[in-house]
Regions:
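Long, contiguous binding/interaction regions
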Residues: 1-90
Length: 90
């Protein structure tokens, strides 16, 4: 079974969103779906708004749609989008 390295971009609803709390919620969703978060970063967007970027590894057969949907359903999230997906080698 192949594994995928996935990058997801999470846009908070506003600049008032606690990004640390949001990051923990997103990591819990990814872990619950069988993923392992490796890298986390913040990307400035505009006017103080920052996007949360998480890179994680997941089994290829699971897919990313359930993760994207669950993250998008969070109250403090405007959108969640997979921005990169690659097969892991080795």
């Amino acid at each position: 079974m192949a594994r995928m390295v996935v990058s997801i971009k999470v846009m908070p609803d506003s600049i008032e969103v606690d990004l640390e709390s949001l990051k923990q919620k997103v990591k819990e969703i990814i872990s619950a779906e069988g993923g392992e978060v490796g890298k986390e970063s913040l990307e400035p967007v505009a006017f103080g708004l920052k996007a949360l970027i998480l890179v994680f590894v997941i089994n290829e057969d699971k897919g990313t749609d359930p993760i994207e949907n669950k993250i998008s359903e969070l109250e403090e999230v405007s959108s969640a989008q997979v921005i990169d997906m690659r097969r892991a080698m080795g």
